[in-house]
């Protein structure tokens, strides 16, 4: 049985890791940490886990974690992981980091997040549909939620060198903003409303550009996010402008081939309800007649495929498990 530690278990992503791993047949959580909640039962913070775990939060001590774990998920705020990851790696642990600390090159990270990086090192970007090398990784940088939906929508056509410009519009549920309440997540400001924000400057744009330019360095990327009155889910609409007209059959073939043997990508009409609670990404497209535009839409659960589920998918691949293990479940439709 694979032994797992979770550093930072009180937030949404930590709670989702605990929920999903509670039914994983080949892994068990042996350590979950929180400085503020040390000594408290996990279910006092995550009451949905009552009767599913007897764990208590502990202070984060890398040496003690290493004695009881094989792999560690770090689910801490941006800027905090870089302080703990080096210690975990020093003890021979494999690490899957759910923060942004290792997703970008050091200089780009410092520019985008306005923080000095304390631990410049390379990690494998953990989008397994694009990075099969996750299976051999010691440190995985789990992708952001917006980039997951955007990159999976855009990658097949961009990888073919067919797209000169991509205009990406994403709409996310409120949980993507994290657990701490803000003016932007306050119920009266969210309900019956759609709130665009960081129209041209959202920090996840850097991840989308990084991955798509790796596939084709001449594609221009534009990205704008919105918050919608939903707890979970991201619906992404990508307007892809191509150099030469393509038929529907041609595009279908490209997507079929690209995602062949990628079990968590389903080519069907996207719906947030159909992916909620699951690790699936549903994708569909439409070719605009007499135009250079192809519209691709993707749907994911931002807490699962956009965060904790994808992290477990990466873990499965790292340890030679079927990537579906513990994750092969439908969305909660309706």
UniProtKB/Swiss-Prot annotation:
Which top-level group of life is the source organism from? Answer: Archaea
Q: What's a GO cellular component annotated to this UniProt protein?
A: cytoplasm
**Keyword Cytoplasm recorded:** yes
Pathway assigned in UniProt: Amino-acid biosynthesis; L-arginine biosynthesis; N(2)-acetyl-L-ornithine from L-glutamate: step 3/4
Using the UniProt record, name the top-level EC class of this enzyme in a single word.
Answer: oxidoreductase
Q: Which GO terms describe its biological process?
A: L-arginine biosynthetic process
> Which residues are named in the active-site annotation?
145
* Residue ranges, annotated region (Disordered): 173-192
Where is it chiefly localized?
A: cytoplasm
Query: Transmembrane stretches, by residue range?
Result: none
State which Enzyme Commission number(s) the record gives.
1.2.1.38
- Provide the alphabetized UniProt keywords: Amino-acid biosynthesis, Arginine biosynthesis, Cytoplasm, NADP, Oxidoreductase
Annotated GO MF terms: N-acetyl-gamma-glutamyl-phosphate reductase activity; NAD binding; NADP+ binding
Per its UniProt record, what SUPFAM superfamilies does this chain match?
A: Glyceraldehyde-3-phosphate dehydrogenase-like, C-terminal domain, NAD(P)-binding Rossmann-fold domains
- Protein's cellular compartments: Cytoplasm
- Record-linked PROSITE patterns: ARGC (PS01224)
- Which family does the similarity line name? Belongs to the NAGSA dehydrogenase family. Type 1 subfamily.
Q: Which PANTHER family match?
A: N-ACETYL-GAMMA-GLUTAMYL-PHOSPHATE REDUCTASE, CHLOROPLASTIC-RELATED, N-ACETYL-GAMMA-GLUTAMYL-PHOSPHATE REDUCTASE, CHLOROPLASTIC-RELATED-RELATED
Primary role: Catalyzes the NADPH-dependent reduction of N-acetyl-5-glutamyl phosphate to yield N-acetyl-L-glutamate 5-semialdehyde.
Q: What is this protein identified as?
A: N-acetyl-gamma-glutamyl-phosphate reductase
The species is Methanocella arvoryzae (strain DSM 22066 / NBRC 105507 / MRE50)
Q: What is the lineage of its organism?
A: Archaea, Methanobacteriati, Methanobacteriota, Stenosarchaea group, Methanomicrobia
């Amino acid at each position: 049985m694979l032994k797992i530690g979770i550093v930072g278990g009180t937030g949404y992503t930590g709670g989702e890791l605990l929920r999903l791993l509670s039914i994983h047949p080949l892994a068990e959580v042996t350590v979950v940490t929180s400085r503020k909640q040390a000594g408290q039962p996990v279910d006092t913070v995550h009451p949905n886990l009552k009767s599913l775990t007897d764990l208590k939060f502990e202070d984060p001590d890398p040496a003690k974690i290493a004695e009881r774990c094989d792999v560690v998920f770090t689910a801490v705020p941006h800027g905090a992981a870089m302080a703990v990851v080096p210690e975990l790696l020093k003890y021979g642990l494999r690490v899957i980091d759910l923060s942004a600390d290792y997703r970008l090159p050091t200089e780009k990270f410092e520019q985008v997040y306005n923080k000095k990086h304390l631990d410049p090192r390379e990690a494998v970007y953990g989008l397994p549909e694009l990075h099969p090398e996750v299976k051999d990784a010691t440190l995985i940088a789990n992708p952001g939620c917006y980039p997951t939906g955007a990159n999976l929508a855009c990658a097949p056509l961009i990888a073919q060198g067919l797209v000169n410009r991509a205009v990406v519009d994403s709409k996310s549920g409120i949980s993507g903003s994290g657990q701490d309440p803000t003016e932007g997540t306050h119920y009266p400001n969210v309900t019956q409303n759609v709130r665009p924000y960081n129209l041209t400057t959202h920090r996840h744009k850097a991840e989308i550009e990084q991955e798509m330019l790796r596939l084709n360095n001449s594609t221009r990327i534009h990205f704008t996010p919105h918050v919608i009155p939903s707890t979970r889910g991201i619906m992404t609409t990508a307007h892809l402008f191509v150099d030469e007209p393509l038929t529907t059959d041609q595009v279908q073939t490209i997507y079929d081939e690209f995602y062949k043997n990628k079990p968590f990508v389903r080519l069907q009409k996207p719906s947030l309800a159909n992916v909620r609670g699951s690790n699936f990404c549903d994708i569909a497209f439409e070719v605009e007649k007499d135009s250079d535009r192809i519209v691709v839409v993707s749907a994911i659960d931002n807490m699962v495929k956009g965060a904790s589920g994808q992290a477990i998918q990466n873990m499965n691949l790292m340890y030679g498990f079927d990537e579906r293990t513990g994750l092969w479940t439908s969305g909660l439709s309706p």
